[in-house]
A protein has these predicted regions:
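Catalytic zinc-binding patch centered on the HExxH motif and its immediate surroundings
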Residues: 304-305, 339-361
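Sec-dependent signal peptide cleavage junction
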Residues: 18-36
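Post-HExxH zinc-binding segment in Zn-dependent metallohydrolases
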Residues: 277-279, 400-430, 434-437, 441, ...
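Short pre-active-site segment immediately N-terminal to the catalytic Zn-binding motif
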Residues: 359, 363-378
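Catalytic Zn2+-binding segment of zinc metalloproteases
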Residues: 383-396, 415
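A well-structured
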Residues: 33-40, 45-309
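C-terminal, non-catalytic "cap/extension" segments appended to globular domains
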Residues: 61, 186, 263, 378, ...
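Sec-dependent N-terminal signal peptides
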Residues: 5-21
Length: 578
């Protein structure tokens, strides 16, 4: 168990939980889902379908008692409007803190600090809402500028808040701080350095602008990979300066600690690189072509006419059979329209779950492919959403363990596998194999992009030629075959730009997710219990290692299990197509 802390003056506020992109998406036929339509109407609203005084019961794999409900106002997404909030509008809140401290009024100081924190959270939420609007139309420069401006307003307001409390810590009434805050929080305020903070804010603004430039490039019909590489080179320079300012030996060390709060080092991650290359990459080499051919031979069209409602129906069907608490969360998501999975060619090509702090609720964003991936992307993001629905999030001091978060999401993908016959009919076998191979792909690419970026950020004088050479070397070491233009493949992965060194979390979490599949094959009820115990652990209070210890899943960082999982997958016929 851990206590999460965030030093806002130095660390970026990473507010987006991105969903896994580029995972070998394949299409799906709609016949099976269409045939389920009437049943879904019944299972989604049993009170309406059952006779008066009766409630239609659906047998679930698990019962209640895994989560504590979180109090919130029940609002639809359309009701969550904040607009822009400037740092100037925040200044009076900090002035109130100063005034209360000068009067040495404990009650007034408490009230001023509380109101300042709530307003700061509101500014952060406004930034998230505007980012969502911008991502819906990534071609709109005005929207992008507005979102960027709001994000900067949050950074500036957070800095003003810390500066104000730092001044209180140096004043004659500094004891007010120890009565209002925990000791570790007071230490943050005391250690605030205005000069370093201003440098950090300048670098953060440069980084945000470069990320915006990449988003604009990725929204085009065809990504200009050379331009994207140029943006990336500038990002590497800026982020390296951030690490130096923070006193870190390397940007990898800085990101692992400050952004992702991992309980292992970049050097430890090399164990995952090794198992990815030795145990999981051979599975991709052996089965990718065979499975692709089977998909082609099956006659499944690449454009299946999948609608958002098809995806929602599938989500509700599966969650209704997991547990009452999972079902409640899914129905709340749908009832209050807390998702955007509609298609638009203007959308940013990604998927993520964003927490809207002022409203105590998460929101799912996804740009669909019109393929089977639309379902698995939603199942994945709902794993994040479920955790956020029950646990909430601390906007100011919470630090997420993304490894645990990704096990909660990739584990949800695994738990849906048992419903594939109902959802996809005759295509279930091949699509189940594809989902499992996607998880193998997560292990391999999660390790590959971590190794790639660790090497990139370790270069003292990085050029574009050297950047591409490093990718070629790393790419080949994971068993992938070169093709024309492959050296720019990394530019299509948005995480490399928005959340550097995030991808190892996919690898670290996909391994126990595949282990969870073995439990699912033996006992769906036991697997559901295991998953819900993982989901019931807040990713701001626990590490992935805590969840693995609690549930008996293997910690691959300490006990290599890749060879065992790979062998069991093959022996079980997970990738065999009849």
């Amino acid at each position: 168990m851990r206590l999460g802390t965030r030093i806002l003056a130095l660390a970026l506020c990473v507010i987006l939980l991105l969903g896994l992109c580029g995972c070998l998406p394949v299409p799906v036929a709609q016949d099976a889902l269409d045939s389920l339509y009437e049943e879904l109407q019944q299972t989604q609203t049993p009170q309406e379908q059952a006779p008066a005084g009766q409630v239609q019961e659906i047998e679930t794999l698990a019962g209640d008692g895994y989560f504590e409900p979180l109090a919130r106002d029940e609002l639809d997404y359309d009701e969550m409007q904040l607009g822009e909030i400037t740092c100037e509008a925040y200044a009076p809140y900090c002035a109130a803190i100063t005034k209360a401290a000068e009067k040495n009024s404990r009650e007034a100081f408490h009230r001023a600090c509380y109101e300042a924190e709530q307003m700061l959270i509101k500014i952060d939420t406004a930034a998230s809402l505007l980012a969502l609007e911008s991502d819906r139309d990534a071609t709109d420069e005005a929207l992008a500028e507005r979102a960027l401006r709001q994000t900067q307003a949050y950074y500036d307001a957070a800095d003003l808040y810390h500066q104000t409390l730092h001044e209180v810590s140096e004043g004659e009434h500094s004891r007010l701080l120890s009565r209002e805050f925990e000791t570790w929080q007071v230490e943050i305020f005391k250690s605030y350095d205005q000069e370093a903070s201003q440098e950090s804010l300048t670098l953060s603004a440069q980084e945000s602008e470069l990320v915006r430039q990449y988003a604009a490039l990725s929204a085009q019909e065809e990504l200009d990979v050379d331009a994207a590489a140029d943006v990336y080179l500038e990002l590497v320079k800026v982020r390296s300066q951030m690490a130096e300012l923070a006193g870190s030996a390397s940007y990898a060390d800085y990101a692992y600690s400050a952004f992702y709060s991992r309980d292992y080092t970049p050097q430890d991650a090399q164990k995952i690189w090794q198992t990815a290359k030795e145990d999981f990459a051979p599975l991709l080499t052996k089965y990718s072509d065979t499975l692709s051919q089977a998909l082609s031979d099956s006659g499944i069209s690449s454009t299946g006419g999948i609608t958002g409602q098809n995806v929602i129906d599938a989500l509700l069907y599966g969650t209704a059979r997991m547990s009452p608490e999972v079902r409640e969360a899914a129905e709340y998501l749908v009832e209050h329209s807390l998702y955007d999975i509609s298609y638009s060619e203007k959308k940013l090509p990604t998927g993520y779950t964003s927490y809207l702090y002022s409203f105590e609720i998460p929101f799912i964003f996804n740009c669909p492919y019109d393929s089977y991936a639309d379902y698995t992307d939603m199942f994945h993001e709902f794993g994040h959403w479920l955790a956020g629905y029950y646990h909430g999030s601390d906007a100011l001091y919470g630090v997420i363990d993304y490894d645990l978060s990704e096990l909660q999401s990739q584990g949800m993908e695994v738990m849906f596998l048992q419903f594939y016959e109902d959802l996809f009919g005759d295509d279930a076998e091949i699509l189940r194999a594809q989902t499992l191979l996607n998880l193998v792909y997560s292990v391999v690419t999660g390790a590959m992009y971590d190794e790639f970026q660790q090497r990139i950020y370790a270069e003292s004088d990085l050029t574009k030629d050297r950047l591409l050479d490093i990718y070629r070397e790393v790419y080949a070491s994971y068993g992938f075959e070169p093709y024309d233009g492959y050296e720019y493949e990394w530019t299509e992965v948005i995480h490399n730009f928005q959340q550097p060194l995030y991808y190892i979390s996919y690898a670290v979490s996909a391994i126990p997710a595949l282990e969870l599949y073995a439990r699912l094959a033996e006992s769906p009820n036991d697997a559901m219990d295991t998953y819900l115990r993982v989901a019931s652990m807040s990713d701001e209070d626990y590490f992935l290692t805590d969840a693995l210890r609690e549930t008996g899943l293997t910690n691959s960082m300490k006990s290599p299990i890749g060879d065992v999982i790979a062998r069991e997958l093959e022996e079980s016929g997970a990738f065999d197509i009849s």
